[in-house]
């Protein structure tokens, strides 16, 4: 199956006349349509809510778009909370899912009235202290089942090796302590696998959490108000990969809900999700220009973007599809390593990739960078983080984050006697 960019060469040239490459660009129309499809897939649950994983794409314009489509924010740090607050997203529109949580972060979440998702049973007392004895009426607890998590005969991940969450006994103990402190309602949460491309992950996770909800209710008498399925739904980074069908996924969760919760009289439980990759990855491109070519033992194409703009290929060996704009239908009769300019040999967007013949000055689109793209950027080698651009529904574009400048890079030396001529 062919991957088609949402950006044309004509539009790219229009944008680059004002905003130089490299930059990340996001497709507003695609983001909105996908958010609506997700909401429709879970419309059978009257309390359903998506809490977008801010870590995936922490830009206020993106959060505003998703909030307009009914999404809240899943925040994991003080700065992510501040970002959500700046957009006007507060209270129970925020899920605070953190681990090894600093007091400043917890205090901010409490002040904002966010749902607090506790990662450890000892955080009950931590929350009580930070909240000055006034614990929230609703608290969420993160579950770690241990062992391995499998779908059929396929092991998806190893929860026993994960630093996150509590055992079931710890959750029951935490619920009992929280009820004594005044908490009335509880949520349960788990994240057991990442970037799954099967329609069975969410339904299987849901079944596990629904059964857990029943056991915890029976053991403690607590009211379980919501089940948070977290993230984990993946995208088809490779053209030949299967693509998740959110309608099938939503129906699978509904069936488990009807089978497990309804007979137990627990049909008031809301379903929450914390998707990031699924919400944004396909609707973002990294746009870059070819600077150089090199012909040694391999053929190299050097871009003005590097791993500082997109870390996933260097960090994980992740595949990201590449389109040469204006050559979408050309024969893929050349083999290139597509690289950036970092002083690291893993700074490669593609290794021995079949592509059309590439010329210096060509504009390349690196697909599926809408999540964990710009957000994982860094300044190694003194590289400056790129701009972010929004391709709006009417075809116009807007700069939604400027590129860093050398002045930005040196700004934190303002406590020193050194001066930098930039």
What are these regions (language model features)?
Residues 1-137, 172, 180, 184, ...:
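A charged N-terminal "starter" segment
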Residues 9, 261, 266-422:
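Charged (often Lys/Glu-rich) extended helix/loop segments that serve as interaction or gating elements
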Residues 31, 55, 77, 109, ...:
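Conserved, mostly hydrophobic/aromatic
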Residues 58-61, 83, 102, 148-149, ...:
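Flexible loop/turn segments at secondary-structure boundaries
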Residues 63, 86, 106-110, 127-130, ...:
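Short acidic, glycine/serine/threonine-rich loops at helix termini
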Residues 72, 95, 117, 140-142, ...:
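Structured core elements
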Residues 134-148:
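Glycine-rich, aromatic-flanked loop segments that form ligand/cofactor-binding clefts
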Residues 145-291, 355:
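Active-site loop/helix belt of alpha/beta enzymes
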């Amino acid at each position: 199956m062919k991957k088609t960019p949402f950006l044309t060469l004509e539009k790219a040239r229009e944008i680059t006349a004002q905003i130089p490459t490299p930059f990340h660009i996001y497709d507003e129309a695609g983001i909105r349509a996908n958010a609506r499809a997700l909401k429709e897939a879970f419309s059978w649950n009257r309390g359903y809510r998506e809490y977008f994983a801010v870590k995936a794409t922490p830009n206020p314009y993106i959060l505003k778009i998703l909030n307009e489509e009914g999404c809240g924010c899943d925040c994991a740090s003080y700065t992510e909370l501040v970002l959500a607050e700046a957009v006007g997203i507060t209270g129970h529109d925020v899920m605070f899912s953190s681990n090894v949580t600093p007091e400043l972060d917890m205090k901010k979440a409490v002040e904002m009235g966010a749902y607090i998702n506790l990662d450890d049973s000892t955080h009950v007392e931590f929350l009580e202290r930070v909240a000055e004895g006034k614990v929230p009426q609703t608290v969420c607890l993160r579950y770690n089942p241990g062992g391995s998590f499998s779908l059929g005969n396929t092991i998806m991940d190893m929860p026993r090796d994960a630093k996150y969450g509590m055992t079931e006994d710890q959750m029951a103990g935490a619920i009992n302590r929280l009820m004594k402190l005044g908490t009335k309602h509880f949520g349960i949460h788990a994240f057991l696998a990442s970037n799954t491309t099967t329609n069975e992950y969410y339904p299987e996770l849901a079944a596990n959490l629904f059964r857990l909800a029943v056991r915890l209710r029976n053991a403690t008498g607590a009211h379980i108000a919501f089940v948070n399925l977290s993230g984990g739904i993946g995208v088809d980074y490779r053209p030949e990969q299967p693509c998740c069908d959110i309608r099938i996924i939503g129906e699978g969760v509904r069936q488990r809900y009807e089978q497990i919760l309804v007979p137990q009289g627990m049909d008031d439980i809301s379903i929450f999700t914390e998707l990031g990759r699924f919400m944004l990855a396909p609707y973002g491109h990294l746009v870059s220009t070819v600077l150089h070519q090199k012909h040694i033992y391999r053929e190299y194409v050097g871009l003005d973007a590097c791993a500082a703009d997109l870390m996933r290929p260097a960090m994980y060996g992740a595949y990201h599809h590449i389109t040469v704009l204006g050559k979408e239908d050309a024969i893929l009769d050349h083999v290139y390593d597509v690289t950036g300019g970092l002083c690291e040999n893993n700074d490669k967007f593609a290794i021995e990739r079949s592509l059309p013949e590439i010329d210096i000055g060509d504009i390349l689109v690196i697909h599926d960078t809408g999540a964990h793209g710009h957000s994982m950027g860094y300044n190694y080698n003194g590289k400056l983080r790129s701009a972010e651009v929004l391709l709006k529904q009417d075809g116009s574009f807007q700069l939604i984050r400027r590129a860093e400048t050398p002045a930005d890079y040196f700004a934190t030396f303002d406590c020193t006697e050194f001066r930098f001529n930039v």
